[in-house]
Amino acid sequence: SNTTANTLKMASLCVAAGARPNVISETIEAVSAARLELTKQIMQTIAFYKDNRVATIEISPAVMAILGDDTDGFVDIIRNVDTVDVAILLKGESPNRTRISLRSKGTDVNAIANHFGGGGHIRAAGCTIEASIDEAKSRLLEVIK
């Protein structure tokens, strides 16, 4: 976790100075109806593999054109499933180019990303595969043990 005793101390000082945590939280968590409609579409793409240890979620090129880089949180939705070890977010940049975000609870996803020319950290990594979302997903699933 990135939350330390110092983080909480600073938060305490902010509240003592007049910061209103509920207002901050509501502002950060606010979502438009349009964003929720897109989220609904994205949620319908969730799939599980390898005895529910691997989960995928997809964002089509059309939806990516609307969202831009605002894809935070989607990979966490599937990573938080109790049986899931490897969570894969597949973002279609174009019909034949897919950007991948990998997260894990135990598996070295950096090794998986390296296989496709990407990299990162043991528990969080990424890569780009010159293929459609379906083809990229198939290639990834072949590599994941």
Region locations from a protein language model:
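Hydrophobic helix-and-loop "lid/oligomerization" segment in the mid-to-C-terminal part
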Residues: 1-115, 120-144
